[in-house]
Swiss-Prot record:
GO terms for molecular function: nucleic acid binding. InterPro entries: Restrct_endonuc-II-like (IPR011335), tRNA_endonuc-like_dom_sf (IPR011856), UPF0102_YraN-like (IPR003509). NCBIfam families: PRK12497.1-3 (NF009150), PRK14687.1 (NF011279), YraN family protein (TIGR00252). Transmembrane segments: none annotated. Belongs to the UPF0102 family. It comes from Psychrobacter sp. (strain PRwf-1). It comes from the Bacteria. This is UPF0102 protein PsycPRwf_0497.
Amino acid sequence: MPANPELLISPKQRQGGGYEQLAADFLQQQGLRLIARNWQQPKVGEIDLVLIEHGRSWNVLVFAEVRKRKLLGYGDALASITRSKQKKLIKTARYFLRHHPEYADFECRFDVVGFTERTGRSGQGEPLQSEWLQGAFLAPAW
């Protein structure tokens, strides 16, 4: 094993991990409980964060996608979740539920946590704007 496994991670992956950590921290501050991070089903896809939101009457399993955008010319971070990406996330979530039958009775929800860096007049990046979109898209019947 390499002495420094971070060397095997691209700068983009390292940066993405930082935003995933920001999102995980934020969602946990909102009362959600993190149960999985970067959950993968080979040849299908990956889910950035899997969390549980405990309600009074029921629990919700939250599959969260974390996005970061630098330029608004292409839309904000939330706009980057295409229909194709939604289908991939839904398919991966189904595999997650097959691997974790203990969550079979939970309601499921797909959220997006988006970070957008705004570029100021100086050309320098300004503080990130974050947005949490609960129920960002719906899955067909499970």
